[in-house]
A protein has these predicted regions:
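Accessory RNA-recognition modules of RNA-modification enzymes
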Residues: 2-259
Length: 259
């Protein structure tokens, strides 16, 4: 009986040592892919709150900074700013962060004119002066010319903008959603197909805003069923407006032949 117990204890001890080896950091590291290993070794982790100095602007208008030479993208941050950020995604070569606090503010930062800014996905740079926007666009082209084209960036001339940077869009495409009796009409939220309710956009031609508001009221009055892209059911999908010198064009995109 004693011999049997000793054998059993030896087996348990071996299994315990094997288990410890398999759960060691070295063993876990060996089981990870290169991508997973890179994420594990990143200087920031999901949920970290870090200070980031912004030195550039990304292709979607987000601020670009670095933490220990690791790139961090921060929406609504501007070059020259130091910001406090909550890391909300970590990839192999970069992370993204949510802006918590502006520690050092850029001289050309302003309050956005649109009360839906930051929710609607239509605009990304309303928090900077228009002159600042033009300067950022010029610098973006210079960076591409130099880094990818291997040309002298001084060849790029300053970006020219209109005298009035508002109410210039002559075409509007507005998604429709919600439910029958509670229709929603506006623009998609950033990075999603969730609709931000709003029929008055400051960068749209005023004619398009009139079209949007009229269609919204008519859809409510006649209780038209909005299209649901998840179920594939419903009627009204989009409102399209186009303003030209010869007149206005209004298009209703539906999922059925009749309203």
């Amino acid at each position: 009986m004693n011999g049997t117990n000793r054998t059993s204890r030896k087996k348990q001890s071996k299994q315990h040592r094997r288990s410890n080896r398999s759960n060691s950091p070295q063993a876990i590291s060996g089981q990870l892919s290169k991508k997973q290993q890179a994420i594990l070794n990143a200087p920031v982790k999901f949920g970290d709150e870090v200070l980031v100095t912004i030195h550039g602007i990304g292709s979607s208008g987000e601020g670009v900074g670095r933490v220990d030479d690791f790139t961090v993208f921060v929406p609504f941050a501007l070059p020259g700013e130091t910001v406090k950020v909550a890391i909300d995604m970590v990839k192999k070569t970069y992370a993204t962060g949510r802006l918590l606090e502006i520690v050092t503010m850029a001289h050309n930062r302003i309050d956005a004119s649109c009360n839906l800014y930051g929710f609607c996905g239509g605009c990304q740079l309303q928090h900077i002066t228009y002159e600042g926007q033009l300067s950022l666009k010029t610098q973006k082209v210079k960076d591409v010319i130099e880094r990818i084209g291997h040309q002298n960036p001084d060849l790029v001339k300053p970006t020219l903008g209109p005298k009035e940077p508002w109410a210039y869009r002559n075409k509007m495409q507005m998604p429709v959603g919600g439910t029958k009796g509670d229709i929603q009409m506006g623009f998609y939220a950033m990075g999603s197909h969730d609709i931000v309710q709003g029929t008055n956009c400051p960068i749209q031609d005023e004619g398009n805003n009139i079209i949007a508001q009229a269609c919204y009221q008519i859809a409510k009055e006649f209780d038209i069923e909005p299209y649901d892209e998840h179920t594939g059911k419903g009627v009204l999908r989009h409102i399209i407006g186009r303003i030209g010198q010869s007149g206005w064009m209004i298009i209703l995109v539906t999922a059925t032949e009749q309203l």
